[in-house]
From Swiss-Prot:
Pathway: Glycan degradation; xylan degradation. It comes from Geobacillus stearothermophilus. Residues 42-406 form the GH10 domain. One of its GO terms (molecular function) is endo-1,4-beta-xylanase activity. This is Endo-1,4-beta-xylanase.
Length: 407
């Protein structure tokens, strides 16, 4: 063995090696300072939307039942100036049966937003999930995707596109004066960089995307803004595939105004550099950018969660604060290219991420969060995530102070 001189690490380098991905010594120091801020009620804390009033609007996703909860209502009025329906404006909620539209729950959200001077995002006109299957059945009730006869396949395609246009026409004409921002299509590109092989695509090819945008513009007019919304827009090969798709559609005259970046992200992934590159790429096409479904999970993928909120270590909240600090500094830097930042929820007491927060146990019944450690049992969706800047008790977290008062 060679004799190797091992030089001692400097304090700064040693600290850097111990930090989560993306965190610098400065951001770690900032996060620690945010932890010392008062753990006060969010109902008395400085208003989040006012902090960014000169940069972009701040939104939250809601379910109608939350509009019956006094604290949720107070939170929305205090901290948010934009709102989006988490589920009740999706196709299966709006038109569960052909020709039978149900606007009751959607109307409640629109009414609340209008009464409180809030912008509204519509989510979503077209999606491969939460869509009723009648869209994809032919006149005889058979699945269109199974048809092999070329003539009948073309007939089925035209029937599907007609149904799609009717769906969009009915909704857009109802809300065009109340809702300015519309997710026209959602998640049309797969993780492999190809157009998602959904029933929409199998039956109609790329034309369903074109018809969706064209119908939204036709019936909504020029005052509404039309978006293509997707997750993992910062990740290759999906990012470039989405870019090429939008570029092609715009060159063909398809009316696309912007990209919605869902931003279901983690403390250490993706990097701010990749996020910045993504925003700049689409802005270069003349498109607006919106952050449409923001949450910062405490966990990696696949999640290995803690079973309760109180079990999550304090350090995780500090790491999350540092991430939010860096993230909103970047959003501010790019605020000429970003018009809205929407959280996919209000506070940590309600988040879709809990449904995939799996808890792993070893043979002795101890919780295992190390992604590389062996385990004996998994309880699906039994854990707790904490992705927002407000806690389940409606108190501010270190992450809140990070984006209100970042340095």
């Amino acid at each position: 063995m060679r004799n190797v001189v091992r030089k001692p690490l400097t304090i700064g380098l040693a600290l850097t090696l111990l930090l989560p991905m993306g965190m610098t010594a400065t951001s770690a120091k900032n996060a620690d300072s945010y932890a010392k801020k008062p753990h006060i009620s969010a109902l008395n804390a400085p208003q989040l939307d006012q902090r960014y009033k000169n940069e972009f609007t701040i939104g939250a996703a809601v379910e109608p039942y939350q509009l019956q909860n006094e604290k949720d209502v107070q939170m929305l009025k205090r901290h948010f100036n934009s709102i989006v329906a988490e589920n009740v404006m999706k196709p299966i909620s709006i038109q569960p049966e052909e020709g039978k539209f149900n606007f009751e729950q959607a109307d409640r959200i629109v009414k609340f937003a209008k009464a409180n001077g809030m912008d509204i995002r519509f989510h979503t006109l077209v999606w491969h999930s939460q869509v009723p299957q009648w869209f994809f059945l032919d006149k005889e009730g058979k699945p269109m995707v199974n048809e092999t006869d070329p003539v009948k396949r073309e007939q089925n395609k035209q029937l599907l596109l007609k149904r799609l246009e009717t769906h969009i026409k009915t909704i857009v004409e109802r809300y065009k004066d109340d809702i300015k921002y519309w997710d026209v299509v959602n998640e049309v590109v797969g993780d492999d960089g190809k157009l998602r092989n959904s029933p929409w695509y199998q039956i109609a090819g790329i034309d369903y995307i074109k018809v969706a945008f064209q119908a939204a513009r036709k019936y909504g007019g020029d005052n509404i803004k039309l978006y293509m919304n997707d997750y993992n827009t910062e990740v290759e090969p999906k990012r470039t595939a989405l870019y090429n798709l939008v570029k092609q559609l715009k060159e063909e005259g398809v009316p696309i105004d912007g990209i919605g970046h869902q931003s279901h992200i983690q403390i250490g992934w993706p990097s701010e550099a990749e996020i910045e590159k993504t925003i700049n790429m689409f802005a270069a096409l003349g498109l607006d950018n919106q952050i449409t479904e923001l949450d910062v999970s405490m966990y990696g993928w696949p999640p290995r969660a803690y079973p309760t909120y109180d079990a999550i270590p304090k350090q995780k909240f500090l790491d999350q604060a540092a991430r939010y600090d860096r993230l909103f500094k970047l959003y501010e830097k790019l605020s000429d290219k970003i018009s809205n930042v929407t959280f996919w929820g209000i506070a940590d007491n309600h988040t879709w991420l809990d449904s995939r927060a799996d808890v792993y146990y070893d043979a002795n019944g101890n919780v295992v969060v190390d992604p590389n450690a062996p385990y004996a049992k998994v309880e699906k969706g039994k854990g707790k995530d904490a992705p927002f800047v407000f806690g389940p008790d409606y108190k501010v977290k270190p992450a809140y102070w990070a984006i209100i008062d970042h340095k």
